[in-house]
Amino acid sequence: EIYGDKLTLYINGYIKNLHDSEDLLIEVFAYLISKRPNIKSSFESYIYKAARNHALMFLRKAKRHIILTEEEMNFCIENTFEDEVCIAERNKRIYDCMEYLPSAQKEALYLVYIEGMSYKEAAAVLRKSAKQIDKLLQLGKKKLRPLLETEGIKSAFND
């Protein structure tokens, strides 16, 4: 429950199919239950790393198949209905703009700004150093700002 929706959206960022993302999430949890790995980092970092690996394995297997449908991601928070609609639309536009970034930058931005992970946690998930995460975020934000401005979004980052 705690990680379900977030991990489903994270996996969906890779495979672009919400139904398959939910199936992969179940596989990730089944893996964790059956293998009971010795987790040396934080559990959250480990589970995101496992989700990423399962998504990449899925994509390697799916290269022979054509994915016909793509689900849209919506990020909603509890607020008034009108605010939820505005926030969801804004977040969708941000996510759509992120699709134009290199995958490492997109993943770093997603983990730090959308999932709220620390640089260290994101570094563990992406198998990079915290300094590399910082650089990916800087480059990603630099490339993303002009795209967001064309969408009418002035400030997407809290810095």
Q: What are these model-derived regions, one by one?
A:
Residues 3, 136-139, 143:
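Residues within the DNA-recognition helix of helix-turn-helix
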Residues 38, 49-69, 87:
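Arg/Lys-rich amphipathic alpha helix in sigma70-family domain 2
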Residues 1-9, 13, 19:
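A short, charge-rich alpha-helical start-of-domain segment used by transcription regulators
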Residues 124, 141-159:
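C-terminal edge and immediately downstream basic/flexible tail or linker adjoining helix-turn-helix-like DNA-binding
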Residues 17, 118, 127-132:
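Helix-turn-helix DNA-binding motif, specifically the short coil turn and the N-cap/start of the second
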Residues 26-42, 61-63:
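Sigma70-family region 2
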Residues 73-99:
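Acidic, proline/glycine-rich intrinsically disordered inter-domain spacer in sigma factors
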Residues 108-112:
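A short pre-motif secondary-structure segment
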